[in-house]
């Protein structure tokens, strides 16, 4: 994985969508969400400010999905279906970026990934974001 101060090259699976992104805090807040949608999507996301993603190619190849409050915006490649990023409901000035799209990064690079509560969303409660579990990966020897 590269340092947090560097820009990361990123792409969907088929390469139709390509972008550069600067992460807000490197990989320190890599996380999953427990909401009904993210539970099915299964991606590990890292953070970037809305202005810190620049599309190199294929922005027109993205399709948008929204549900429930229509606040969060989830983008996917129309060709291969890979989720690239989403605008967060908890902070609309921030994107969650799929780590699997980042060049040289895999979700399996993270031995532990916190799972934040998306069922009782921080926007719906005064308690703010909370961790409801930890997803662990241990490679076979």
Language model: regions and residue ranges:
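A short Gly-Trp-Pro
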Residues: 1-11, 16-141
């Amino acid at each position: 994985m590269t340092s947090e101060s560097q820009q990361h090259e990123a792409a969907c699976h088929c390469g139709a969508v390509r972008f550069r992104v600067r992460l807000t805090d490197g990989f320190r807040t890599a996380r999953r969400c427990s909401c009904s949608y993210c539970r099915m999507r299964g991606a590990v996301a890292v953070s970037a400010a809305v202005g810190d993603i620049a599309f190199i190619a294929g922005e027109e190849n993205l399709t948008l999905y929204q549900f429930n409050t229509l606040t969060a915006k989830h983008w996917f490649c129309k060709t291969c279906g890979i989720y690239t990023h989403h605008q967060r409901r908890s902070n609309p000035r921030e994107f969650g970026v799929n780590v699997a799209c980042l060049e040289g990064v895999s979700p399996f690079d993270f031995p532990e990934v916190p799972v934040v509560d998306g069922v009782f969303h921080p926007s719906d409660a005064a308690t703010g974001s909370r961790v409801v579990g930890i997803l662990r990966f241990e490679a076979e020897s």
